Swiss-Prot record:
Cross-referenced InterPro entries: Chaperone_TorD (IPR023069), DMSO/NO3_reduct_chaperone (IPR020945), HscB_C_sf (IPR036386), TorD-like_sf (IPR036411), TorD/DmsD_chaperones (IPR050289)
Subcellular location: Cytoplasm
Source organism (scientific name): Aliivibrio fischeri (strain MJ11) (Vibrio fischeri)
Alphabetized UniProt keyword annotations: Chaperone, Cytoplasm
Pfam families cross-referenced by the UniProt entry: Nitrate_red_del
Cellular component aspect of the GO annotation: cytoplasm
PANTHER family attached to this UniProt entry: CHAPERONE PROTEIN TORD, CHAPERONE PROTEIN YCDY
Keyword Cytoplasm: yes
Single biological process term from Gene Ontology: protein complex oligomerization
Function: Involved in the biogenesis of TorA. Acts on TorA before the insertion of the molybdenum cofactor and, as a result, probably favors a conformation of the apoenzyme that is competent for acquiring the cofactor.
Covalent S-S links between cysteines: none
Official protein name in the record: Chaperone protein TorD
Family listed: Belongs to the TorD/DmsD family. TorD subfamily.
Keyword Cytoplasm among UniProt keywords: yes
Length: 215
């Protein structure tokens, strides 16, 4: 494994991690893991990247605050519901269609576009996650898989084509709406844990675009 493929694996893991945070409420066991040495080391290492430092430290601060709550898991689950599962008037709905399609309806063209990406690269949506294809967690899971597929390409030309596909996907399917998604999450997530997650997501996406574009 060379340096670039190893870096790609790290990128995929970060996208999968963010996907898991935005797909469902954290269980008690998962929340306890966020206090572990392994996870805290992962976050500290991530914060060593200057462009990510503020966003990661904001998340660490909220994690520390979560663990000081009396009923941490239940309260954080309520935060997740308030942040993402309400109406478009009260929550930051995690679907591209809500931000990119004038109809304001779920399962609009952005969801169809996402289904086409899944089909093109033969990546299946997880059967147990019964959401429209343009849910943020599905898009991030797809991106992690696309990165891993990039490392499996036999030729330099194919590898480059897959790297370019990642860049196109991030610009068209993610950065086209996640900044606004983050803004609304900041407004509506009163405790701020999930706003810190979406803030880190947008910061990481912007940094990743620079990497993929060779800047």
């Amino acid at each position: 494994m060379n340096e670039l493929t190893a870096f790609n694996e790290q990128r995929a893991e970060i996208y999968w991690w963010l996907s898991s945070l935005l797909s469902a409420e954290l269980t008690t066991e998962q929340l306890e893991q966020y206090g572990s040495f392994e996870v805290r080391t992962f976050l500290s290492n991530l914060a060593e990247t200057p462009e990510l430092s503020d966003s990661v430290n904001a998340l660490i601060e909220k994690l520390n605050a979560v663990q000081g709550r009396e009923d941490a898991q239940l309260e954080l689950s309520a935060d997740f519901c308030d942040a993402f599962l309400g109406s478009d008037k009260s929550s930051a709905l995690p679907y591209a269609s809500m931000y990119l399609d004038k109809s304001g309806l779920l399962n609009a063209k952005p969801a169809q576009d996402m289904r086409e990406w899944l089909t093109k690269y033969n990546i299946a949506q997880k059967a147990e996650f019964n959401e429209p294809a343009d849910h943020i967690a599905i898009e991030l899971d797809f991106l992690g898989n696309l990165i891993v597929m990039t490392n499996q390409q036999a030729s330099e030309d194919e590898f480059e084509a897959y790297m370019n596909a990642q860049l196109t996907f991030i610009n068209e399917q993610l950065l086209s709406w996640t900044p606004r998604f983050n803004e609304i999450c900041i407004e509506r997530d009163k405790f701020g844990f999930y706003a810190a997650v979406t803030g880190l997501l947008v910061t990481f996406l912007k940094l990743d675009v620079k990497f993929l574009a060779g800047e």
